[in-house]
């Protein structure tokens, strides 16, 4: 029903991995870091030219170098056949790292949503509007200075840098973003 009406949903991590793999070419699928490692190691055979896999990597610490490197290897292996959304981040410099890795959508925000458990459990919070402004300003400064901008554009299929998604979080992985 959702797909027929062009409503995007994210299949949560609570759905078994094999089912999520089957749904990847139809809608966005949430993966943990270990799931992405498994996906990166898969030989998917011949991917149809028009087939695209939509993956949202859901991780508490979007600044992890391991995450960025892993996403970069997935993008290098599957190219335009994978659309990656990941995060959350709370640092404009990490946005640039994501762009260089070829990530398509960057989830920005930490502890700012009404249901996000990061602030309550980890004592970490960053005001959403301030953070989005900082990331956007940093993005524009980078493009204006052309510092790394061409490398970032080459990293993924878009002519611009990755899209910014204001993500207020959720209290369990069954929530739709």
Each model region followed by its residue ranges:
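Alpha/beta enzyme core
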Residues: 3-167, 171-177
